[in-house]
């Protein structure tokens, strides 16, 4: 028996590119998505044949594209970042904004919560990284040793024994920051084009980065060194996502999602949207999120859809 992915359905509701998707173990029947239509949608997963889920709430307030969204660990709150230069904290029970985070001077491209949900980090086209508390107060702005071009992505490590932030930038660098003093710990060199995205493994030991050079690079966060590179994306990498319970890394580039088994460094499966007709161009995959149980992969695209794949066993 071997594992492969099967397309289960789509989620339709956004009026623009689906830029990010968030899931939570607390609510397995809910996901949250962000879009260039300036809104966020809370979805209730019905898993029906006709539609995999229905929009339950739309969150409105941002004045420009919503670039990123993350859920608090209890699933009660969402944090979003937007090209309107702000972050917003949302109470999902009411659908209202509880805090606006003002301070960035350009588009906010990325937001993240620390493991304990007490700290928030954001990255922006103003090239800075800001640390905030949940009251919306900016506690620190990282400017020394920061990216010399747009800060494209920021992520906390889930490992509380090693409190770090990882960031990527259009200056081709992946940077690791010591959270205790906000000082630079490591510069990771290797990418030959801008870096779009970075993601940290569930145990905090690894991080993966990708962008223009279509190489997924893996870095050891404990040792601060380059481990290996997964080649063959062929297109700009827009999203990366570790499986929560398998040694897999999903790499989205162009219309394709490659699922790499990191043990054997082999592609387990490649997922592509079905395209009607020969003239239509396949949509680009921009965002990826696994369900907490690692059985379902959600992917957001430039055709405004979220596609849903499920892990299934097949006999060889």
Swiss-Prot record:
Alphabetized PROSITE patterns for the sequence: WD_REPEATS_1, WD_REPEATS_2, WD_REPEATS_REGION
Pfam families per UniProt: WD40 (PF00400)
Keywords, ordered alphabetically: Repeat, Ribonucleoprotein, Ribosomal protein, WD repeat
UniProt keyword annotation of Repeat present: yes
GO molecular function: ribosome binding; translation regulator activity
WD repeats: 4-46, 52-93, 94-135, 137-180, 181-221, 222-263, 264-312
Ribonucleoprotein found in the keyword field: yes
A single Gene Ontology CC term: ribosome
Similarity comment: Belongs to the WD repeat G protein beta family. Ribosomal protein RACK1 subfamily.
Protein name: Small ribosomal subunit protein RACK1
Species the sequence originates in: Biomphalaria glabrata
């Amino acid at each position: 028996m071997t594992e492969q992915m099967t397309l289960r359905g789509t989620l339709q509701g956004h009026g623009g590119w689906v830029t990010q998707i968030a899931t939570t173990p607390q609510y397995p029947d809910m996901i949250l998505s962000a879009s260039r239509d300036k809104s966020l949608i809370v979805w209730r997963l019905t898993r029906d044949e006709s539609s995999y889920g229905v929009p339950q709430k739309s969150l409105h307030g941002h004045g420009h594209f919503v670039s990123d969204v993350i859920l608090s660990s209890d699933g009660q709150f969402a944090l979003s970042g937007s090209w309107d230069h702000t972050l917003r904290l949302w109470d999902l029970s009411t659908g209202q904004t509880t805090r606006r985070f003002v301070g960035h001077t350009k588009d906010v491209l990325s937001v993240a919560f620390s493991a304990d949900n007490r700290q928030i980090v954001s990255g922006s086209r103003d090239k800075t990284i800001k640390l905030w508390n949940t009251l919306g107060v900016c506690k620190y702005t990282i400017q020394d040793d920061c990216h010399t071009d747009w800060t494209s992505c920021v992520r906390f490590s889930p490992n509380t024994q090693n409190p770090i932030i990882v960031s990527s930038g259009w200056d081709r660098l992946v940077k690791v920051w010591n959270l205790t003093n906000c000082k630079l710990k490591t510069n990771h060199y290797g990418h030959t084009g801008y870096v779009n995205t970075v993601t940290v493994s569930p145990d905090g030991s690894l991080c993966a980065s990708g962008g223009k050079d279509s190489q997924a690079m893996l870095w050891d966060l404990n040792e601060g060194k380059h481990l290996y590179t997964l080649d063959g994306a062929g297109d700009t990498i827009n999203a990366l996502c570790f499986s929560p319970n398998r040694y897999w890394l999903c790499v989205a580039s162009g219309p394709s999602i490659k699922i790499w088994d990191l043990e054997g460094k082999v592609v387990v499966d490649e997922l592509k949207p079905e395209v009607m007709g020969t003239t239509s161009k396949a949509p680009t995959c921009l965002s990826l999120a696994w369900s907490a149980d690692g059985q379902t992969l959600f992917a957001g695209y430039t055709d405004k859809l979220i596609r849903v794949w499920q892990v299934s066993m097949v006999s060889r």
